[in-house]
Amino acid sequence: MKMKRWLASAVLPFVFLAAAAEATPHVPLHVYEWVQSSARANYFFNKRVTHYGLTAEGVLNPRVLIVPTLQTYDDVAIADVVAKRRWRGESLAGYDDLVGEAEYLRIDLAAGTSTLERADDLDSTWSSITTTFPKNVTVIKDLPEKSLERKFLEAVLAYERGHRMEIAAQTKKTLTTDDLKRMEEHEREDLTASLLGGSAQASEEKAQKDHGAKADRKGGK
């Protein structure tokens, strides 16, 4: 499925202001959860599309979390991506309109791992310029505590812990008795809390505080 179609189906209106060199993409916070910003990029995940896995029988598997993510770049980050592709001898077609990257993560809560299933470089129409399937597996607890990736994944996990039934409803329109039983077991196991190192509540509170602060800034408060 093309990235443009996926974004459109989820009704994700992005608005660009001013010229490309100076434009700052507006990401709707009712769809995307802002996690953090570095010097060169902003990091979000799509809370409206995040969902659990399914077993071969179609039963909810809350031990697996599927998370679409988004990074938006500034001009320096864009130039860096282009320079690296040029150095590697890769095609630059479409990269004059690069604005960011979408990734699809598969988080295995039982194993404590995150797998990068797919990555799409995006242009200003949110179409995919290039798609890759890295399949890189990261052990979450092995990441440095202050790394951007660790902080991002912990924010996703904290969100999952506070929005489980909402995520379940996004996975299946109608939850069966078996689905609800799996969710009850998931609540009892609380694998997410163990991955957060016992600081799940603090992480969630921080994520909510950061989200509120970002919303206030967007609203001009």
Question: Could you say what each language-model-derived stretch is?
Answer:
Residues M1-A10:
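Bacterial N-terminal signal peptides that target proteins for export
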Residues R5, V15, A23-T24:
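Generic ordered-secondary-structure signal
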Residues S9-A18:
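Bacterial N-terminal signal peptides
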Residues A23-E103, D108-K221:
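N-terminal secretory-pathway/extracellular module detecting exported/lumenal segments
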